[in-house]
């Protein structure tokens, strides 16, 4: 296990959206559908947040281009994280408490910082990126994976025509 390092433990990736948020960087909040361009996070530090109707539960979205420190991450495209810091019960304790006691993902049935794989049964890191090798160019309430909160309610935003532009 190389932890968060790639390239057999020799190369750290750039900080991701979760780490940047924990360090105090504020994401741009998306509240409606629009045509957007998301630059690689290492170039601008820019990432999006989409809130659910449940306070403290939201999604973070970032772009990776697989260059520089990210040359060993195994892919490129948009990454999506489902974050839960709410009052939801996640294995007998509240999700917000899991963050306080450093047990964020220790309950596998309700991870509180979950990478949403573009291909839900991904077995290879290349399959987690949107559109990625699976050419998954949509992310919405009724797509698979679903863009919903833990109660299966849609978030009110959808992404169509996800693509990587040169």
What residue ranges belong to the model's regions?
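Non-catalytic C-terminal accessory/binding modules of secreted extracellular proteins
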Residues: 28-166
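Post-HExxH zinc-binding segment in Zn-dependent metallohydrolases
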Residues: 1-25
């Amino acid at each position: 296990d190389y932890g968060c390092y790639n390239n057999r433990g020799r190369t750290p990736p750039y900080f991701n959206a979760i780490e940047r948020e924990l360090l105090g960087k504020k994401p741009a909040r998306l509240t409606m559908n629009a045509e957007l361009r998301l630059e690689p996070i290492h170039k601008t530090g820019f990432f999006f947040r989409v809130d659910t109707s449940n306070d403290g539960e939201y999604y973070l979205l970032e772009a990776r281009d697989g260059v520089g420190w990210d040359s060993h991450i195994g892919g490129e495209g948009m990454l999506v994280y489902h974050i839960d810091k709410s009052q939801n019960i996640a294995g007998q304790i509240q999700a917000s408490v899991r963050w306080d006691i450093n047990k964020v993902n220790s309950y596998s049935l309700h991870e509180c910082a979950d990478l949403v794989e573009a291909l839900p049964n991904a077995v290879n890191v290349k399959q987690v990126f949107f559109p990625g090798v699976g050419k998954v160019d949509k992310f919405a309430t009724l797509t698979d994976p679903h863009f919903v909160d833990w109660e299966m309610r849609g978030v009110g935003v959808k992404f169509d025509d996800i693509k990587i532009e040169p």
